[in-house]
Amino acid sequence: VGNKMGQRRVLITDITETRFTNGLASIIEKKMNKLMHNIMQTCDYVIIPEIGDDRGNIRYVGPVVRQVSADRNTLRKRIGFRKNVILVTGGGTDAGKYLIQKAIEVHPSLQSKLDSELIIVPGPSLRLPDSREYRNLGFVNNMHDLIYAADLVISLAGRSTMDESMAYGTPGIFIPIKNHFEQEQGAARFGFKYEDIFRLAYLIEEKIGCRSNTMDMKGAARAAKIISMLM
């Protein structure tokens, strides 16, 4: 519609094609991917929230993440993080239940050695029983602050959690949902695959506390600037 009306157009997406299906269903998917590519070609700009090299009308602005509310030490005191914190999130749905259960299973054997505490954010749909083995935060609206304050993040390979972990310098273990192409592709960027869940204890020991430098967090500002140029 915008094309026919001669309006300026910007598409913001982190997926330029899908690979969910096989067999006959893949024929429909290929047509949808072709339609997506056609839409991209008719836009003035396609904004992708990843790190990459611009080409044609595609602009890579870097991760779009929320600004943390305080410095890391202040956040840890405010939240009550004293030990080495392993933050586990299931991504807000039951899909992450298997990952949370695995983290609960392996942590007791590591707790004394790592002086660690298991903090779980299962989200709104998954109910966990009370236990001395972990601290259950349920659903939170400041996940980005928790990620920044933690010493390790264990999560499904969801875009926002991975981007925030990378931007804030917090090490992460990202296990994709099996046969979910987008999550498998995202996890592979960090060197992980589904089978890594079976060596979770080893990965926790390897990754915890290995912080990296915080990254440029101006993806949203770059996207806004591109959009404003067309107004």
Where are these regions (language model features)?
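Nucleotide-activated sugar donor-binding and catalytic core shared by glycosyltransferases
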Residues: 1-117, 125-231
